[in-house]
Amino acid sequence: SEPDSDEAWAKVRHDIANELRVWVDKAAAGIDFDPANLKLTSVKASGTSALLQIGHDSQQIVVGRRSLSRMARWFMGSLSASLAEAAEVPVTVVRIAGSEDETVTEAIANALTPGDKPVHYTQPQPVVEEARRPVVVGVDGSETSRRAFDFALEEARLHDAPLHVMFCWQLKDLGVIPGYENAVAPVKVGQRRAEEILSELMAKARIPDGVKVSTNAFHIPASKGLIAASRYASHLVVGSRGLSGLDAHFLGSVSRQIVNFAECTVTVVH
């Protein structure tokens, strides 16, 4: 039952602080970290509102992604997706590997395979080991994506990782292409324009010494392309630009889809 006095609440907070301390000590084992820089806080509030309030002027908010199936994450939403949409600071969502998708995938495979012989689904093994995977940033030439690019550069520098800059484009993302003001540009012309946008971004960038940067433009919807890229990345960084409100829930903004379905850690930059 809920505590009914100030003394009871004080005891609850004390117990929570002890549990947090035990958890942190275990999680930080083997990490070069000064405990003096750590502050433990417990509040009685919904996760989203509490983290937004505590983290409103922080460098970033970091959370783990809840273990729901893909369908449940789309239908019910998640704390991490809500934070990524509402926060004014970068939100990093650490993917915690789980077996829920693998179990459902195996059930689907068995349901659709003729005969009675069971089908066993095995998660494909990554081509590149995690320690060598790049930081990937999705850009589109907008101011928000420029901030995402700057954030990704710093992440790559801190972790001594290569940075891969991706522009996943469709013709509507490219604006008016010279010579095609009243016509639909061919894909090869769009590809050339997308590569020009990437080149313009890189020309203005200040690349830290030692950071290896590569670029690619792909003719594919941003959410689909970046989720595919997440299978080969250690960290995926995107801007928050996209749909909002009812349309975002039913159609899905790029950032919401990536937070819910990416296969690596994701940061959404505002």
Predicted regions, residues:
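Small/aliphatic-rich secondary-structure junction motif
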Residues: 1-10, 124-183, 235
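Acidic, proline/glycine-rich short linear motifs
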Residues: 1-21, 101-124, 167-196
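A short helix-to-beta-strand connector/capping loop
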Residues: 29-39, 207-214
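Intrinsically disordered or low-complexity boundary/linker segments at protein termini
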Residues: 35, 59-60, 65, 81-147, ...
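Charged docking surfaces used in two-component/phosphorelay signaling
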Residues: 42-49, 217-224
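Structural alpha-helical scaffold elements that stabilize or flank donor/cofactor-binding regions
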Residues: 51-54, 83, 128, 229
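Glycine-rich, Arg-bearing micro-motifs that act as flexible, cationic patches
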Residues: 63-86, 100-107, 235-260
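Protein-protein interaction modules outside structured cores
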Residues: 179, 188-196, 214, 224-228, ...
